[in-house]
């Protein structure tokens, strides 16, 4: 009986010591969690303070001179960092200016010469120009990779044509071709009017009138001479 009581007492003591250890571990865990929560809260408060500090004095602006897709459309104004903002704006302006500058082509890319189509060409894309054999086109410059930027003879359309499909016209050939071109309609009309029968009749009448005036002048001179001889009574 005494042995059983001793064993029960030992078990009780073991349970008590185990509970104390468990409670101690739980208390430490609770304290540790409390410290972590305080640290997180402190960090959040610092972040919020920094955010409030960084957003104070900033005014969001929009520049409607630029499209919505352009980065220059949106911006902000900071009273404390106005100089930095001006420097940033100037750099952005320079970048934009450089992007807007015209691209200068190398001299060997510029053609500015007329050409004649050697073969028919059917365009496969909207930026290509249709050619028929014998068409005259004006080549502005080389587009690259065997393509030329051409304009049709009427000047109504511009597009790309294959370089091997055309042959350049030399200046002297171009001059001869210009001379052999048909006259404009208004020149033909003027020439036709100038040689019409009505004009010929009018010109003939005017010529006859001028001839009569000349003969009348000669007769008048003869009469004056005869009158002078009579009055002077010149004798041999």
UniProtKB/Swiss-Prot annotation:
UniProt xrefs under PROSITE patterns: SH3
Any coiled-coil regions, as ranges: none
Pfam families: SH3_1 (PF00018)
Keyword terms of this UniProt record: Cytoplasm, Phosphoprotein, SH3 domain
Subunit structure, as described in the record: Interacts with PBS2 and PTC1.
Species for this entry: Saccharomyces cerevisiae (strain ATCC 204508 / S288c)
GO annotation, biological process: fungal-type cell wall organization or biogenesis; negative regulation of MAPK cascade
Gene name per UniProt: NBP2
Modified residues (Phosphoserine): 102, 196, 235
Cellular compartments per GO CC: cytoplasm; nucleus
Further information: Present with 521 molecules/cell in log phase SD medium.
Name this protein carries in UniProt: NAP1-binding protein 2
GO molecular function list: protein-macromolecule adaptor activity
Main location as per UniProt: cytoplasm
Top-level taxon: Eukaryota
InterPro entries: SH3-like_dom_sf (IPR036028), SH3_domain (IPR001452)
